[in-house]
Structures are given as C-alpha cells and as structure tokens.
Amino acid sequence: MKLRGLYAITDSQLLDDGRLLPYVEAALRGGARLLQYRDKSCDQARRLREAASLRELCERHGAQLIVNDDAELAARLGVGVHLGQTDGSLSAARALLGRQALVGATCHASLELAEQAVADGASYVAFGRFFNSSTKPGAPAASVELLDQARPRLHLPITAIGGISLDTAPGLIARGVDLIAVIHALFAAASAAEVERRARAFSALFETA
C-alpha cells in the first residue's frame, strides 16, 4: 500500500460520547488511508477494545491502523505504531512488530531526527507543527523550507502535522508531503456526515496534486 493521502488521527476528547466509531468510519468512507488511534488514558481494557474496533473498520475500508505510543498494543492487534521522541525505542518497536509493520516517527522540525528515524527502521517520518495546533500548542514550529531540504534526502513518505486545514494543506502537498495528518480540521464536526465531507475534500487535494 502506497502511503499517500489523508492521515486521520483520533482525539479522545473530540470523539467522546459515542462519536469515535461513527466519526472514524465517516473519515474512512471519505478516503482516509491511515488512521492513528491516539488515546493517552490509562484504561488499558478500553483502549484494547476501541483499537480492535478501529482495526475492523480499517480492514473494511482498505485503510491501515496505527496506534500512538504503544508498541505492545500494536503487536497484540497486528497493526502499526507511531512513536514520539519520548515514546521509546523505534528500533525496538520495529524488532517487536516485524519488517512489514508500519512504524512512524515524530521528528518535530529536525531533519537530523528524521534521518536517525530512517536508520532505525521508520516507515514514514512526521514533521510539524506547521501551523498553530490545538492538540500540541507548545510543539516546535516547522517551516516549509524544511520540506524542501527533506524531500531529496529522505526516500520514504513524509507526513505533515500541526494545525493543518483545507486551506493550508495544498501548499504542503506541493512541497512534496505524502501524508497530511489532521485531527481538529477533520473531527471537530457536528455530524458524521460533515466528517465524511471534510475527509473527501482533503483526499481530493491529492488527486489534483
């Protein structure tokens, strides 16, 4: 599967009160190719249950599930994992999950971190925040010039994250970004139908790029 398109990331606060599964399915119907389950709570039983349900939805829609910051849960479910810089060893996650698993790495605004992630076995790297982010307002800012430097040096998919909207995504795609990671601009919606409409709009940006 080529890693290109909309990368949907869940948020436990945005998707509470029973919204998680219907909103995620709407995003998948709208064309999301990757889904990251991001839940920082300590309720292991709920996290396992929700992640298993999301895996079924992804399989149904031809997408791939990635678990944030929990290689053991990812291994249990046979899915991928995304690791931040403080979330543990990327090479250990690769060894645990196997050669075929998707393993992503947060690299903030650092090309050096990205090159190290590649050496450690990452499937893709994520740069950002590119714009003001509701999820991580204190994250280091990344510039579009970083993408110009990264594209010729990194021979694997590049993800952009951080406050990205339908208005700002085209400029990032034009700079060679393969995946646009979105949380609020996708899931902060009044209905599942609106989530699907937004997902289709994001996905369409890659068809014209």
Curated annotation (Swiss-Prot):
GO terms for molecular function: magnesium ion binding; thiamine-phosphate diphosphorylase activity. Condenses 4-methyl-5-(beta-hydroxyethyl)thiazole monophosphate (THZ-P) and 2-methyl-4-amino-5-hydroxymethyl pyrimidine pyrophosphate (HMP-PP) to form thiamine monophosphate (TMP). It catalyses: 2-[(2R,5Z)-2-carboxy-4-methylthiazol-5(2H)-ylidene]ethyl phosphate + 4-amino-2-methyl-5-(diphosphooxymethyl)pyrimidine + 2 H(+) = thiamine phosphate + CO2 + diphosphate; 2-(2-carboxy-4-methylthiazol-5-yl)ethyl phosphate + 4-amino-2-methyl-5-(diphosphooxymethyl)pyrimidine + 2 H(+) = thiamine phosphate + CO2 + diphosphate; 4-methyl-5-(2-phosphooxyethyl)-thiazole + 4-amino-2-methyl-5-(diphosphooxymethyl)pyrimidine + H(+) = thiamine phosphate + diphosphate. Belongs to the thiamine-phosphate synthase family. Binds 1 Mg(2+) ion per subunit. Mg(2+) binds at residues 69, 87. One of its GO terms (biological process) is thiamine diphosphate biosynthetic process. CDD domains: TMP_TenI. Pathway: Cofactor biosynthesis; thiamine diphosphate biosynthesis; thiamine phosphate from 4-amino-2-methyl-5-diphosphomethylpyrimidine and 4-methyl-5-(2-phosphoethyl)-thiazole: step 1/1. GO terms for cellular component: cytoplasm. Its EC number is 2.5.1.3. Pfam families: TMP-TENI (PF02581). 4-amino-2-methyl-5-(diphosphooxymethyl)pyrimidine binds at residues 36-40, 68, 106, 136. It is an enzyme of class 2 (transferase). It comes from the Bacteria. This is Thiamine-phosphate synthase. Keywords: Magnesium, Metal-binding, Thiamine biosynthesis, Transferase. Signal peptide: none annotated. Its cofactor is Mg(2+). 2-[(2R,5Z)-2-carboxy-4-methylthiazol-5(2H)-ylidene]ethyl phosphate binds at residues 133-135, 163.
